Amino acid sequence: MKIKVLGSAAGGGFPQWNCYCRNCQGVRDGSIAATARTQSSIAVSDNGRDWVLCNASPDICHQIAANPELHQPGVLRGSAIGSIILTDSQIDHCTGLLNLREGCPHQVWCTPEVHADLTSGFPIFTMLQHWNGGLVHHAIQPARSFSVAVCPSLRFTAIPILSNAPPYSPFRGRPLPGHNIALMIEDTASGSRLLYAPGLGEPDAPLLELMSQADCLLIDGTLWQDNELANTGVGRNTGRDMGHLALGEERGLMTLLGELPAARKILIHINNTNPILDGSSDERLALTARGIEVSYDGMSIEL
């Protein structure tokens, strides 16, 4: 299995266009050991030629341009992306579908709850009906496995996770099980397993059991502290409000990851305020000491 990290930042990217916190200003002027990052999405493949896009970032066009693996030379118009899977209906994971309208129809896999959000409060499916067939919905049922034709050796299993519905959803603060899923992606040819969870509020016992079975974890690294936005002076929401378990809290995600046997533990969906973006920070060094990696745009992983 081949995995390509197309974007590694949380919503707004890094630096965020209107933010001048220490991190954002530091990456602009070079005063911290950091690199710019686009908003979170990955692509996976069983052969390195055909790809499944997992989440469609607002930066997807730039991400495709920056990753030749996703190009399809030799045709007048085309893409190596054959299917799209959405793990939630958050704006930073779905807006890129609008930017891909020239390639419609697209095969899009998501839960009924996500599809409902994307046909009502943020009606991308409805809008794109006017572009060559739009988005063809394939329903994901939580806790059930499925495959896609473009990568037949990959088996995807949707795992309901504790997080939150997006701010525009009527289910904000009271999400249903299908509003947020992790994906267990298994290469049936090699047996290797990736667990992808870019939005993770609280790992429960069933999820921790599945995380212990994965060879690689690609996990939500949004915040270091639960009250990080308030401490930085840029917002009031806590990580838990937004559906993210902070890394550095007591029994936070860093501690949990340190107890799991996966050969690789990699963070994705990193907010612009998170000190781990500075490669020389104490927080980054603490992760490194525990064998936890921080993903970056263009990162290639092979299992």
From Swiss-Prot:
Coiled coil: none annotated. Keywords: PQQ biosynthesis, Transport. Pathway: Cofactor biosynthesis; pyrroloquinoline quinone biosynthesis. GO terms for biological process: pyrroloquinoline quinone biosynthetic process. It comes from the Bacteria. May be involved in the transport of PQQ or its precursor to the periplasm. Belongs to the PqqB family. This is Coenzyme PQQ synthesis protein B. It comes from Erwinia tasmaniensis (strain DSM 17950 / CFBP 7177 / CIP 109463 / NCPPB 4357 / Et1/99). The gene is pqqB.
